[in-house]
């Protein structure tokens, strides 16, 4: 099984943070966060888009189990998934924004292609 980054958080906090980050990303089309969080969120967001491309009821229920808002799931299935119907992965891109003032953490913008 694939190794996940721990992000310096307890398991429940990390899972909740990633679910919220992916939900926000799918809702707005882009999100600004640290590079390690963006890499983890990108993995899950791409899995959610791939599931949405299937478009069946089971895929919708699997996405609903991870994404926290029903409106975002509807948007994912109705608008985002058809946009990537002919693309096999690589739905996101990351732009480095440089170090964050205050703690120097490397910040990136994660966005849909």
Curated annotation (Swiss-Prot):
Annotated keywords: Ribonucleoprotein, Ribosomal protein
An MF annotation (GO) of this entry: structural constituent of ribosome
One Pfam family, short name: Ribosomal_L17
Keyword Ribonucleoprotein in annotation: yes
Keyword Kinase applies: no
Gene Ontology biological-process entries: translation
Superkingdom assignment: Bacteria
GO CC entries: cytosolic large ribosomal subunit
Subunit structure comment from the entry: Part of the 50S ribosomal subunit. Contacts protein L32.
Family statement: Belongs to the bacterial ribosomal protein bL17 family.
HAMAP family documented for this protein: Ribosomal_bL17 (MF_01368)
Protein name: Large ribosomal subunit protein bL17
Lineage of producing organism: Bacteria, Bacillati, Bacillota, Clostridia, Eubacteriales
């Amino acid at each position: 099984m694939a190794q996940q980054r721990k992000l310096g958080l307890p398991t429940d906090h990390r899972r909740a943070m990633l679910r919220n980050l992916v939900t926000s990303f799918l809702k707005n089309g882009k999100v600004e966060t640290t590079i390690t969080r963006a890499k983890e969120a990108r993995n899950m967001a791409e899995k959610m888009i791939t599931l949405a491309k299937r478009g069946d009821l089971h895929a919708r229920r699997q996405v609903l189990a991870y994404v926290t808002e029903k409106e975002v799931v509807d948007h994912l299935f109705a608008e985002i998934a058809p946009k990537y119907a002919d693309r096999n992965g690589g739905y996101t891109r990351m732009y480095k924004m440089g170090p964050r003032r205050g703690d120097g953490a490397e910040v990136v913008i994660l966005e849909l292609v």
